[in-house]
């Protein structure tokens, strides 16, 4: 059985015991979080409009981490003008513990 969940403006296909990295969630390591379900596939397939009623996915927060550094470099030729900025996105690693149906 798998489900499609939405968090952080993105959709993820998950199954029980999957470990996924999502945008930062306000939860400490070891806490439980719940996600809404957009699509549920098992013995039958349920498609939500926009969500599947009564279905939810429960996950446990494994850790809070940060992504790889992304460099934004701008240069204006012949003007000795340069700007270099770095960015690291805050991420949360979660383990899917349960997919509950209606």
From Swiss-Prot:
Molecular-function GO terms, alphabetical: rRNA binding; structural constituent of ribosome
Keyword Cytoplasm found: no
An annotated GO BP: translation
Highest taxon above the source species: Bacteria
Record's keyword annotation contains Repeat: no
A single cellular component GO annotation: cytoplasm
InterPro entries assigned: bL21-like, bL21-like_sf, Ribosomal_bL21
The protein's assembly and partners: Part of the 50S ribosomal subunit. Contacts protein L20.
Cited NCBIfam families: L21
Biological role stated in the UniProt entry: This protein binds to 23S rRNA in the presence of protein L20.
The family this protein is said to belong to: Belongs to the bacterial ribosomal protein bL21 family.
Name the record gives this protein: Large ribosomal subunit protein bL21
Organism (species): Azorhizobium caulinodans (strain ATCC 43989 / DSM 5975 / JCM 20966 / LMG 6465 / NBRC 14845 / NCIMB 13405 / ORS 571)
